[in-house]
Curated annotation (Swiss-Prot):
The gene is argS. Keywords: Aminoacyl-tRNA synthetase, ATP-binding, Cytoplasm, Ligase, Nucleotide-binding, Protein biosynthesis. This is Arginine--tRNA ligase. The lineage of its organism: Bacteria, Pseudomonadati, Campylobacterota, Epsilonproteobacteria, Campylobacterales. It holds the Pfam family DALR_1. Its EC number is 6.1.1.19. It is found in: Cytoplasm.
Length: 530
């Protein structure tokens, strides 16, 4: 709707301007401060300019009123125009707020947790954000592909195999073992040890078989990770292996050398990242000739940036903040525009239950498992809460609030609005088709504002995607639900003289809730279950 209004205004004003959304919809639905920017050029006061501009909009079908107020140009949308938009939305509900196909393309890499254990709650935040960003981008018409980078090489995979070997020796063979400083622990390691012992037999468990044991366990963990993601309604298009990039390392090093991006010193090969804004240079090849994790990651990012996407997006944990300058430096040395590599950071999550820290999982050692939280509160509540705050800010929430059936539980409160609308239609004995001819002319000011809010979802979705600020969607839903409940409590619907107008208004509210929830990966309920 906002883009339509913008274009209508531009036809008349014939110049560029900013279109704002005033908080008080009783004053205006849209406003522009254009008169202030024209004041110097026209040598007139903003008030006079705004008044002159307002006079150009007389008898325009889109607007109920266009007024000059303190230098601003305030626009109120007409009921007739809002009704036209409502008819379009209700006639084609599956296309409501969808964007036209765009040329811009994106590759999103996210989650990419080491396949050494189940996903924990820290992984879950980036996973939910990435999946929702994907749903939103595709809905708005962008080409958007997703990928999981499987870290299946290096020391962490070897440690997984070693941890299982030591668990077999200790818990099954009852040998005395000495654990290294770093190893994986938890019930899942014991379970893997039991399964491996049954599969391979006693003779298999020696140090020389650690790589084979690690590979077997890594594959098991990747299956588990995919199950964890599926449980939260998250689907990633493709999984790529770190090992598959081994053969490309030398070519990447040659390219970096050619562009003076690396140098040798102290028997190591260094990335000259300090030349590109990093705080210091970074080792990419050790003295023994082995590549560091950074080396493998550079090869992978070179491949991603070469695939022709307009932008490559990564979602990383906030602890990877210092990693950004070195990766962007490497991409610049390789001839890419580092602005086309976008990094979104997912901050830490603190989980409470009844005001106390949530218990760590025995299965995973010192972590809260994503699957445990989904089992307790459901994927809808998990997804909502992880989207309720900007991804790069710390998130603390008490899962007890998400089990309440009142306004303190936002998922319940919003779903209750959706279910309430279905209940009202049932009580009136009507369906949406029965109210399509209603013209909405009887709506009072609060009703018009509620209708405007429901129809303004497209603008919210565009803003949320462009700013990568997905919290705008749950914020919108909370306000929409609150305004609906208030309006419902203040207005008689069934049996009223304007019943059809109100039911048509409500159907738009329900459509907006269902559409926004769907993009968040949440099911809108037609009936509340107790």
């Amino acid at each position: 709707m906002k883009s339509i209004i913008f274009n209508e205004i531009k036809k008349i004003l014939e110049c560029d301007f900013a279109l704002e959304n005033p908080k008080d919809k009783n004053l205006a639905h849209f406003a522009t401060p254009l008169a202030f920017s024209l004041a110097k050029e026209l040598k007139k006061s903003p008030m006079l300019i705004a008044s002159d501009l307002a006079s150009k909009f007389q008898n325009h079908d889109c607007f109920e009123s266009v007024e000059a107020v303190n230098g601003y140009l305030n626009f109120r949308i007409s009921k007739t125009f809002l009704n036209e938009l409502a008819n379009q939305a209700l006639t084609n509900p599956n296309d409501f707020t969808k964007g036209e196909k765009k040329q811009e393309s994106f590759l999103l890499e996210y989650v990419s947790a080491n396949p050494t254990g189940p996903l924990h709650i820290g992984h879950a935040r980036g996973a939910v954000f990435g999946d929702t960003l994907t749903r939103l981008a595709r809905h708005l018409g962008y080409k958007f592909n997703t990928e999981y980078y499987v870290n299946d090489a290096g020391n962490q995979i070897y440690l997984l195999g070693l941890s299982i070997l030591l668990s077999v020796k200790e818990s099954i063979l009852h040998e005395n073992v000495e654990y290294p400083e770093q190893y994986y622990k938890g019930e899942y390691i014991v379970d893997l040890a039991k399964e491996a012992f049954e599969k391979f037999g006693k003779e298999f468990f020696s140090e020389e078989n650690i790589p084979s044991l690690a590979d077997w366990a890594k594959d098991k963990m990747l299956v588990l990770i995919k199950q964890n993601l599926e449980q939260a309604k998250i689907k990633i298009d493709s999984y790529v292996s770190e090992r598959s990039y081994y053969d490309a390392l030398n070519a990447t090093l040659e390219s970096l050398k050619e562009h003076k991006g690396i140098y040798e010193q102290e028997g190591k090969i260094w990335l000259a990242s300090s030349q590109k804004g990093d705080e210091k240079d970074r080792v990419i090849i050790r003295e023994d000739g082995r590549g560091t994790y950074l080396a493998a990651d550079i090869v992978y990012h070179k491949d991603k940036m070469s695939r022709g996407y307009g932008k490559c997006i990564n979602i990383w944990g906030a602890d990877h903040h210092g990693y950004i300058p070195r990766m962007k430096a490497a991409m610049e040395f390789l001839g890419f525009d580092s602005n086309n590599l976008e990094i979104i950071l997912a901050q830490m999550v603190s989980l409470l239950k009844d005001g106390e820290p949530y218990k760590m999982s025995k299965r995973a050692g010192n972590f809260i498992l994503m699957s445990d939280v989904v089992d307790e509160i459901g994927s809808d509540a998990l997804r909502y809460i992880f989207l309720s705050k900007k991804c790069d800010t710390h998130l603390e929430f008490d899962i007890s609030d998400l089990q309440k059936e009142d306004s303190s539980n936002p998922v319940y409160y919003i779903n209750y609005a959706h279910a309430r609308i279905h209940q009202v239609f049932a009580k009136a004995g009507k369906k949406i088709d029965d109210v399509m001819k209603a013209d909405l002319q009887s709506l009072n000011q609060d009703g018009v504002n509620l209708l405007f809010e429901a129809l303004n979802l497209k603008a919210v979705l565009n803003d949320a995607f462009e700013a990568r600020a997905l919290q705008k969607i749950p914020d919108y839903l909370k306000n929409l639900a609150a305004n609906f409940h208030k309006f419902y409590n203040e207005n008689k619907v069934v049996g009223s003289a304007n019943e059809n107008d109100l039911l048509k208004l409500f159907s738009l509210v329900a459509l907006s809730i269902k559409t926004a929830f769907s993009l968040m990966g949440i099911e809108a309920k037609n009936k509340m279950e107790h």
